[in-house]
């Protein structure tokens, strides 16, 4: 909003029932994660559970309800992007010291993500078990979110794309991207409803959207273009109405029918891919 409209006043006021501005509320939101969800104080917060992560039944990587155990590489990347957004807001609002603090915090977090979550042998970003300090060796699409965050060294990006993302035996299903690698023992397609919606192999459009932009940022335009094409074909051509998520092998739409949430991102992916709009 600030970037496109220049409306600084909106960030400096808040709802009538709040005593703090929207800008201050956004700062508190980020601080919440570090204050209440980083139990070992290493700068990397944990998900409450797979439900909390939004990937409902990825229990093998994010835990069961109220475990508060697994440091999510995706969560850390989301917070990194929020810190960079706060840096931009602070600059627009003339808060130079705030902007500097957000920039420093973002840089420190990016370093932690690349130090703690990256596995050199496998060439992949894994979550971390805060209790044991060990990586959670589950290949989830969450491991590609660092590409979207823009914090992956080029050589690592190449490994992510060539060894994992575009491998048809892992994530590049008939209608990519699978949210779990095919090599995972609990990989499954279809609307199984064992715990919320199925995120253990199916295709979810917001994941594709973020990965596409990560591919563009790292110079993999051909792969990004192919992903955009396959995604819009899946949503628009293979199904009569937009659905909540999709079977990555058959292309069948799953979940809510006539879903007007994140799945509509598919319709703008080809445009954004060709124009670079983000």
What is each PLM-predicted segment?
Residues 7-8, 78, 86, 188, ...:
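Short amphipathic alpha-helical "recognition" segments used for binding
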Residues 38-71, 111-203, 236-278:
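Extended glycan-interaction surfaces of carbohydrate-active proteins
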Residues 9-35, 86-114, 155-169, 219-234:
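Extended, well-ordered alpha-helical scaffold segments
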Residues 77, 81-93, 105, 109-112, ...:
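Long, repeat-rich segments with strong aromatic
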Residues 7-9, 60, 80, 100-104, ...:
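Short, intrinsically disordered low-complexity segments
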Residues 1-50, 73-76, 80, 136, ...:
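Aromatic-rich carbohydrate-recognition surfaces in CAZymes
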Residues 67-81, 98-101, 105, 138, ...:
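Short, contiguous, pocket-lining structural segments
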